């Protein structure tokens, strides 16, 4: 399956971690946003929202939004291994709800605040980050630390879930950019 991605993208890395966990090989299609490759007509035909990551399955099914892709990969490619599916994306409604909550926390709070603080510096050539946005991002990291109190993984349990992959990818970006993550166990 084709996977349109950018190596430095946390959402793309989360999908790559999920694909590796379920044993799916991705045909990597580097998509250079700085060159506008995501705005070319052939890409827009696949994904009118012109975002990455974008997955094109063997049968032509197209999906974007990293967390949706993660869920799809587990549901489709773990059918042969229910135990693996259960570890990555639990079937129990309460455990799955916590995984969803952590995924939504990542997309709406953690990664969003990371992007609000760092993207102006990365893409806008702004040298210094906005102190208010830094405080907001640090607050999101404190929420994450609260989730991890007494836990090995962000959604609890004994095994990492797709929520861990998603949040880990964001935290790796934070670490590269020298954010302060004190007690995160992932």
From Swiss-Prot:
Any one GO BP annotation for this protein: glutathione metabolic process
Enzyme class: transferase
InterPro entries in alphabetical order: Glutathione-S-Trfase_C-like, Glutathione-S-Trfase_C_sf, Glutathione_S-Trfase_N, Thioredoxin-like_sf
Gene Ontology cellular-component terms listed: extracellular region
Annotated keywords: Transferase
Every GST N-terminal domain range: 1-81
GO molecular-function term, one example from the UniProt record: glutathione transferase activity
SUPFAM superfamilies: GST C-terminal domain-like, Thioredoxin-like
Residue ranges annotated for the GST C-terminal domain, each copy included: 92-186
EC identifiers of the protein: 2.5.1.18
Residues given in the record as glutathione binding sites: 9, 50-52, 65-67
Entries under Pfam families matching the protein: GST_N
Catalysed reactions, semicolon-separated: RX + glutathione = an S-substituted glutathione + a halide anion + H(+)
Assigned protein family: Belongs to the GST superfamily. Theta family.
Function description: Conjugation of reduced glutathione to a wide number of exogenous and endogenous hydrophobic electrophiles.
Subunit: Homodimer.
Name of protein: Glutathione S-transferase 1, isoform A
Organism: Anopheles gambiae (African malaria mosquito)
């Amino acid at each position: 399956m084709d996977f349109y991605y950018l190596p430095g993208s946390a959402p793309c890395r989360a999908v790559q971690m999920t694909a590796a966990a379920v044993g799916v090989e991705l045909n990597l299609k580097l998509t250079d946003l700085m060159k506008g490759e995501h705005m070319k007509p052939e890409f827009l035909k696949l994904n009118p929202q012109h975002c990455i990551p974008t997955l094109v399955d063997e049968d032509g099914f197209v999906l974007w939004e990293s967390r949706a892709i993660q869920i799809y990969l587990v549901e489709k490619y773990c059918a042969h291994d229910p135990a693996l599916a259960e570890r990555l994306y639990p079937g129990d409604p309460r455990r799955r709800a916590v995984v969803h909550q952590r995924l939504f926390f990542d997309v709406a709070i953690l990664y969003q605040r990371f992007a609000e603080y760092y993207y102006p510096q990365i893409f806008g050539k702004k040298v210094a980050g906005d102190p208010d946005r830094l405080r907001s991002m640090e607050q999101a990291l404190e929420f994450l630390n609260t989730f991890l109190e007494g836990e090995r993984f962000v959604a609890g349990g004994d095994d990492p879930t797709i929520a861990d992959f998603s949040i880990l990818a964001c935290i790796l970006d934070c670490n590269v950019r020298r954010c302060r993550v004190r007690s995160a166990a992932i």
